[in-house]
Amino acid sequence: GSKTAKANVNLSTADFALDHYVAVTTEGQSAGVEQLFAADFNQKIQASNAQNHSRNGVVKLLKKQKGEKLNCTVSTDIIEESADYRIAKVTLKFENFTKTDLVTLERVGNDWKVSKSINSYK
């Protein structure tokens, strides 16, 4: 069998998936990172030099940050949702700046996955 045991993360609802995404991106959680992101996941960073990150790059980075808690206040707003689709705005307030992450979640089979993330800073 494979050496890395699959962490069993419950992604059966959009709420669970979104909570897990926040835990992974802000609290250094690394369990179930692979399951969380859709195969075609893409991350865009809106900045003076806009960047695009593939699924592999983001998964790698998040695994590297395992255990690192960001020093910020997190708030989540649901912008739009349907039975198979949800867009949420995750706001990370740091001392000197705010990061806004627009997250798109989609139902894939029985699980919810993050398919897109657009970050901006102010």
Regions from the PLM with identified roles:
Residues 1, 98-122:
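Short beta-strand edge/turn micro-motifs at domain boundaries
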Residues 28-44:
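Short, well-ordered alpha-helical segments enriched in acidic and aromatic residues
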Residues 40-42, 93-95, 120-122:
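Solvent-exposed loop/turn segments at secondary-structure junctions
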Residues 42-51, 67:
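A short gly/proline-enriched turn/hairpin at secondary-structure junctions
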